[in-house]
């Protein structure tokens, strides 16, 4: 899968959250010794310390663009989000730090997102262990300095990493051998008009089957918008959808994204609109 897609932040199991999240144990937390990850016999990815990373201001309004990609890169790394008063609220890791921060500021109250510190991995595709060790190091540094974990990393706090509420992929028919009582084109029309945002993709929302579909899903998720997906490759439940949809939308390729019953376009158009802030404005209408 393409690592450049705007995916959601990596979710770590609750068992990996620091025991110091409980006040009684915060002063005794000890992480296992850090060992540099190796690939081909060479150590990789040296991360900046939390205390040495420079804060980057986060605009309070989601409609305002984030700082440029040099300040907040769309790359793998570790990041810490601070409230406007300068208190660390959450430490996370991501394959796309920029997309993760964008997703946070759209879902988390504005009084929790004032600035962010970032340290980017040396490699384009670092091993997960490398990122996890950086995450542990930042948490350990903060806990050593303050005696407690950031609120968002405390077990039971779902403000930042709550389980995603994803609706299942929609199916247009019960099965390919079931006789339809209405034309397939009418089902498509009803679907795109009854749901604010619909993405017709190759594969499922959780497992897109092409890079373009994966990128579209990542962009929509990073905007925090509610959307439904339809798998155009599902010949059992969406038999004939691809050809019928091409005629309905007068658009020859997939994915296809509809907003408010109108076709927005495919991956290139959606990506361009997202970069210009036009997609966020469209979702607010």
Swiss-Prot record:
GO terms for biological process: monoatomic cation transport. InterPro entries: Glutaredoxin, GRX_PICOT-like, Monothiol_GRX-rel, Thioredoxin-like_sf. One of its GO terms (cellular component) is mitochondrial matrix. It is found in: Plastid, Chloroplast. Residues 1-40, 53-72 are annotated as: Disordered. [2Fe-2S] cluster binds at residue 210. Residues 185-285 form the Glutaredoxin domain. PANTHER family: BIFUNCTIONAL MONOTHIOL GLUTAREDOXIN-S16, CHLOROPLASTIC, GLUTAREDOXIN FAMILY MEMBER. Belongs to the glutaredoxin family. CGFS subfamily. May only reduce GSH-thiol disulfides, but not protein disulfides. This is Monothiol glutaredoxin-S12, chloroplastic. It comes from Oryza sativa subsp. japonica. The gene is GRXS12.
